[in-house]
């Protein structure tokens, strides 16, 4: 039998060679695949558009109108008048803005560093680390409304735990939530109880992504734990720090549930989110006014979200 120079018998059948057409057919989508893909993309998109984009854009549009919420034919276009009145003749606006700023600064200076410190400690794989993480993270699972109820009981003037402890030392009961000079700080401590666990988890995730070789190299060079953290670990946490900043800004703006549960957001606890609710669902039903304040909150949040997005794109280019 003759044999070709390629080593394949001339009489043998040619081996099956996949063609381009065969490759295309192997990756051809079935009708079921298309339906599943359409549902997986379409349903979340519709939910996002219906529950996020439509309300947000509607709020922006209504901020340029005067409307009492009764009948679409009663909507009146007034341009920037709502914004001018908010910044010039609306007394609660600047105190609420100041309280939100205090909320943000307090979050950045107190619970965020505490969360970072706890993350560094728990990253060392101590005994019962998982238990500690669960206990510290537990308040994050609770809604802000439930946190408000818990701390309202803690701060109670007559039967609260804090005043009961102070009474053992001969201190008279303190009205933590009724005193305008104290209630904001009392509520900030309650909010920090939840925020610490949130920051701890974020920083733990960031610490797990730091290359252990960097820490080992710093230790070989004779760096102390503090020096290794300051000059090696913390700079490597820059992406997480941006995330923490954005989340903290958003948390400080959306702090509505906690103060509304405690005293309805009055008497020293005015916040921008409370003003939005009071104008939209209050007795006056000033939909345009409340929408204008909500739009101001949206703009503030968008600034930090854009900073975060630009940072992500910059990291990807590297």
Region spans (language model):
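Short, Lys/Arg-rich, polar N-terminal cytosolic tail immediately upstream
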Residues: 2-31
């Amino acid at each position: 039998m003759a044999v070709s120079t390629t080593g394949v018998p001339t009489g043998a059948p040619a081996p099956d060679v996949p063609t381009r057409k065969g490759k295309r057919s192997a990756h051809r989508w079935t009708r079921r695949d298309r339906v599943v893909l359409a549902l997986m993309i379409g349903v979340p998109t519709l939910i996002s558009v219906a529950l996020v984009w439509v309300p947000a854009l509607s709020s922006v549009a209504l901020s340029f109108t005067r409307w009492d919420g009764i009948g679409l034919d009663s909507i009146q276009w007034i341009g920037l008048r709502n914004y001018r009145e908010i910044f010039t003749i609306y007394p609660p606006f600047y105190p609420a803005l100041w309280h939100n700023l205090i909320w943000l600064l307090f979050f950045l200076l107190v619970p965020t560093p505490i969360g970072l410190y706890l993350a560094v400690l728990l990253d060392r794989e101590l005994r019962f680390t998982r238990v500690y993480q669960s206990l510290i993270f537990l308040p994050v699972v609770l809604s802000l409304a439930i946190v408000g109820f818990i701390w309202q009981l803690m701060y109670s003037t007559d039967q609260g735990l804090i005043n009961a402890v102070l009474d053992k030392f001969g201190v008279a009961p303190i009205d933590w939530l009724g005193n305008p000079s104290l209630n904001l700080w009392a509520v900030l401590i309650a909010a920090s109880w939840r925020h610490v666990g949130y920051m701890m988890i974020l920083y733990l995730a960031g610490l797990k992504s730091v290359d252990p070789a960097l820490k080992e190299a710093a230790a070989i060079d004779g760096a102390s734990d503090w020096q290794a953290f300051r000059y090696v670990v913390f700079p490597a946490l820059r992406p997480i720090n941006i995330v923490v900043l954005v989340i903290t800004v958003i948390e400080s703006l959306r702090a509505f549930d906690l103060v509304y549960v405690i005293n309805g957001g009055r008497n020293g606890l005015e916040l921008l989110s409370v003003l939005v609710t009071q104008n939209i669902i209050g007795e006056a039903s000033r939909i345009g006014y409340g929408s204008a304040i909500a739009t101001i909150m949206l703009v503030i949040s968008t600034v930090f979200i854009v900073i975060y997005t630009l940072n992500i794109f910059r990291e990807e280019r590297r």
